[in-house]
Amino acid sequence: MIVPDRHDPRTVGDATWAVHGGNAVDGGSGAIRTPIIMANAYLLPDDPSGIDWSNPEQLLYTRTTGANQQALEAKLAAMDGGAAAAVFASGVAALHGVFFCFLASGDHAIVSDVAYEATWRLFTELLPAKYGIEATFVDTSDLDAVRSALRPNTRLIHTEVIANPTTRVADISELAGIAHNAGAVL
Protein backbone atom coordinates (compact mmCIF):
# COMPACT_ATOMS: atom_id res chain seq x y z
CA MET A 1 0.00 0.00 0.00
CA ILE A 2 1.26 3.47 -0.89
CA VAL A 3 1.21 5.99 1.92
CA PRO A 4 -0.20 9.33 0.68
CA ASP A 5 2.36 12.13 0.64
CA ARG A 6 0.94 15.54 -0.29
CA HIS A 7 4.33 16.49 -1.79
CA ASP A 8 4.45 13.49 -4.16
CA PRO A 9 1.85 13.42 -6.96
CA ARG A 10 2.33 9.67 -7.46
CA THR A 11 0.83 8.95 -4.04
CA VAL A 12 -2.31 11.10 -4.13
CA GLY A 13 -5.26 11.66 -6.44
CA ASP A 14 -5.72 14.54 -8.85
CA ALA A 15 -8.07 16.44 -6.52
CA THR A 16 -5.60 16.21 -3.62
CA TRP A 17 -2.73 17.31 -5.86
CA ALA A 18 -4.83 20.24 -7.12
CA VAL A 19 -5.14 21.42 -3.50
CA HIS A 20 -1.62 20.68 -2.25
CA GLY A 21 0.59 20.74 -5.39
CA GLY A 22 2.86 23.75 -5.62
CA ASN A 23 2.11 24.90 -2.07
CA ALA A 24 4.82 25.95 0.32
CA VAL A 25 4.69 27.32 3.84
CA ASP A 26 4.61 31.12 3.64
CA GLY A 27 7.82 32.43 5.20
CA GLY A 28 6.29 35.70 6.33
CA SER A 29 3.13 34.41 7.98
CA GLY A 30 3.70 30.70 8.50
CA ALA A 31 0.46 29.97 6.59
CA ILE A 32 0.31 26.46 5.16
CA ARG A 33 -1.96 27.67 2.35
CA THR A 34 -0.63 30.30 0.01
CA PRO A 35 -2.05 33.64 1.11
CA ILE A 36 -3.47 36.12 -1.38
CA ILE A 37 -1.18 39.13 -1.44
CA MET A 38 -3.03 42.37 -2.17
CA ALA A 39 -0.04 44.40 -3.35
CA ASN A 40 0.96 45.87 -6.69
CA ALA A 41 4.45 46.99 -5.62
CA TYR A 42 7.06 45.72 -3.19
CA LEU A 43 9.59 47.27 -0.82
CA LEU A 44 12.85 48.16 -2.54
CA PRO A 45 16.16 48.91 -0.84
CA ASP A 46 17.20 52.53 -0.38
CA ASP A 47 19.94 51.90 -2.94
CA PRO A 48 18.34 49.91 -5.78
CA SER A 49 21.56 49.74 -7.82
CA GLY A 50 22.14 46.14 -6.71
CA ILE A 51 18.76 44.90 -7.91
CA ASP A 52 18.74 42.43 -10.79
CA TRP A 53 15.73 43.90 -12.62
CA SER A 54 15.65 40.98 -15.06
CA ASN A 55 15.32 38.31 -12.35
CA PRO A 56 11.82 36.87 -12.85
CA GLU A 57 11.75 35.48 -9.29
CA GLN A 58 12.35 38.84 -7.62
CA LEU A 59 9.21 40.59 -6.42
CA LEU A 60 9.55 44.17 -7.64
CA TYR A 61 6.35 45.14 -9.41
CA THR A 62 3.27 43.10 -10.30
CA ARG A 63 3.40 43.90 -14.00
CA THR A 64 6.57 41.82 -14.01
CA THR A 65 5.57 39.17 -11.48
CA GLY A 66 3.87 38.91 -8.13
CA ALA A 67 3.43 36.52 -5.24
CA ASN A 68 -0.01 35.41 -6.44
CA GLN A 69 1.24 34.85 -9.97
CA GLN A 70 4.20 32.82 -8.72
CA ALA A 71 1.90 30.71 -6.52
CA LEU A 72 -0.46 30.03 -9.44
CA GLU A 73 2.43 29.13 -11.72
CA ALA A 74 3.85 26.73 -9.10
CA LYS A 75 0.44 25.08 -8.66
CA LEU A 76 -0.15 24.70 -12.41
CA ALA A 77 3.33 23.25 -12.91
CA ALA A 78 2.78 20.80 -10.06
CA MET A 79 -0.62 19.73 -11.38
CA ASP A 80 0.81 19.12 -14.85
CA GLY A 81 4.01 17.46 -13.62
CA GLY A 82 6.08 20.23 -15.19
CA ALA A 83 9.18 22.01 -13.98
CA ALA A 84 7.58 25.43 -14.42
CA ALA A 85 4.56 27.24 -15.82
CA ALA A 86 3.82 30.74 -17.04
CA VAL A 87 0.55 32.61 -16.76
CA PHE A 88 -0.50 35.62 -18.79
CA ALA A 89 -3.15 38.30 -18.47
CA SER A 90 -4.91 37.21 -21.66
CA GLY A 91 -4.86 34.61 -24.40
CA VAL A 92 -3.34 37.08 -26.84
CA ALA A 93 -0.55 37.83 -24.35
CA ALA A 94 0.09 34.09 -24.09
CA LEU A 95 0.24 33.80 -27.89
CA HIS A 96 2.76 36.65 -28.04
CA GLY A 97 4.83 34.94 -25.35
CA VAL A 98 4.91 31.63 -27.21
CA PHE A 99 5.57 33.10 -30.64
CA PHE A 100 8.33 35.45 -29.47
CA CYS A 101 9.92 32.66 -27.44
CA PHE A 102 10.19 30.23 -30.34
CA LEU A 103 10.40 32.43 -33.44
CA ALA A 104 13.06 34.84 -34.68
CA SER A 105 13.66 36.87 -37.81
CA GLY A 106 13.90 34.61 -40.85
CA ASP A 107 11.87 31.80 -39.28
CA HIS A 108 8.74 30.21 -40.72
CA ALA A 109 5.58 29.03 -38.99
CA ILE A 110 2.73 26.82 -40.15
CA VAL A 111 -0.57 28.16 -38.84
CA SER A 112 -4.08 26.76 -38.95
CA ASP A 113 -6.14 28.42 -41.67
CA VAL A 114 -8.96 28.62 -39.12
CA ALA A 115 -7.42 30.73 -36.39
CA TYR A 116 -8.43 33.25 -33.79
CA GLU A 117 -8.51 36.71 -35.39
CA ALA A 118 -5.64 37.99 -33.24
CA THR A 119 -3.50 35.00 -34.29
CA TRP A 120 -4.31 35.69 -37.93
CA ARG A 121 -3.31 39.35 -37.57
CA LEU A 122 -0.08 38.48 -35.77
CA PHE A 123 0.99 36.20 -38.61
CA THR A 124 -0.27 38.36 -41.50
CA GLU A 125 0.67 41.81 -40.20
CA LEU A 126 2.94 42.19 -37.17
CA LEU A 127 5.33 39.23 -37.38
CA PRO A 128 6.17 39.49 -41.10
CA ALA A 129 6.32 43.30 -41.26
CA LYS A 130 8.26 44.02 -38.07
CA TYR A 131 10.17 40.80 -37.43
CA GLY A 132 10.62 39.06 -40.78
CA ILE A 133 8.76 35.94 -39.67
CA GLU A 134 6.85 34.15 -42.42
CA ALA A 135 3.74 32.01 -42.09
CA THR A 136 1.90 29.52 -44.24
CA PHE A 137 -1.77 28.97 -43.44
CA VAL A 138 -3.02 25.41 -43.96
CA ASP A 139 -5.78 23.09 -42.83
CA THR A 140 -3.90 21.55 -39.88
CA SER A 141 -6.33 18.61 -39.82
CA ASP A 142 -4.85 17.68 -43.24
CA LEU A 143 -1.49 16.16 -42.28
CA ASP A 144 -0.29 16.02 -45.90
CA ALA A 145 -0.96 19.77 -46.24
CA VAL A 146 1.07 20.37 -43.08
CA ARG A 147 3.96 18.23 -44.38
CA SER A 148 3.84 20.05 -47.74
CA ALA A 149 4.06 23.42 -46.00
CA LEU A 150 7.26 22.52 -44.12
CA ARG A 151 10.37 24.51 -45.00
CA PRO A 152 13.93 24.19 -43.74
CA ASN A 153 13.33 27.26 -41.55
CA THR A 154 9.99 26.06 -40.08
CA ARG A 155 10.27 26.47 -36.31
CA LEU A 156 6.64 26.31 -35.16
CA ILE A 157 3.32 24.69 -36.03
CA HIS A 158 0.28 26.40 -34.52
CA THR A 159 -3.17 24.84 -34.51
CA GLU A 160 -6.40 25.46 -32.67
CA VAL A 161 -8.42 22.54 -31.39
CA ILE A 162 -11.34 22.53 -31.76
CA ALA A 163 -11.25 25.11 -34.58
CA ASN A 164 -13.97 27.72 -34.23
CA PRO A 165 -16.38 27.98 -36.06
CA THR A 166 -15.66 24.91 -38.22
CA THR A 167 -15.24 22.45 -35.29
CA ARG A 168 -12.39 20.90 -37.27
CA VAL A 169 -10.13 18.75 -35.11
CA ALA A 170 -6.41 18.37 -35.77
CA ASP A 171 -4.54 15.24 -34.69
CA ILE A 172 -2.29 16.67 -31.96
CA SER A 173 -0.16 13.53 -31.65
CA GLU A 174 0.56 13.37 -35.38
CA LEU A 175 1.21 17.11 -35.59
CA ALA A 176 3.64 16.82 -32.68
CA GLY A 177 5.49 14.08 -34.55
CA ILE A 178 5.67 16.16 -37.73
CA ALA A 179 6.92 19.16 -35.76
CA HIS A 180 9.49 17.09 -33.86
CA ASN A 181 10.84 15.49 -37.04
CA ALA A 182 11.21 18.95 -38.60
CA GLY A 183 12.98 20.42 -35.57
CA ALA A 184 9.97 22.61 -34.82
CA VAL A 185 7.61 22.96 -31.87
CA LEU A 186 3.86 22.48 -31.82
Whereabouts are the PLM-identified features?
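N-terminal "arm"/small-domain region of PLP-dependent enzymes with the aminotransferase-like
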Residues: 2-66, 74
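Buried hydrophobic positions in well-ordered alpha/beta secondary-structure cores of metabolic enzymes
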Residues: 30, 76, 94, 109, ...
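Conserved N-terminal alpha-helix of the aminotransferase class I/II PLP-enzyme fold
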Residues: 41-96, 118-126
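Short helix-loop-beta connector
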Residues: 79-83, 103-106, 152
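Conserved PLP-anchoring active-site segment centered on the Schiff-base-forming lysine
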Residues: 101-119, 138-139
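Short, small-residue-enriched loops and turns at beta-alpha junctions
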Residues: 116-117, 143-145, 162-168
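A glycine-rich helix N-cap at a beta->alpha junction
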Residues: 126-141
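Catalytic PLP-binding core of fold-type I/II PLP enzymes
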Residues: 151, 156, 169-186
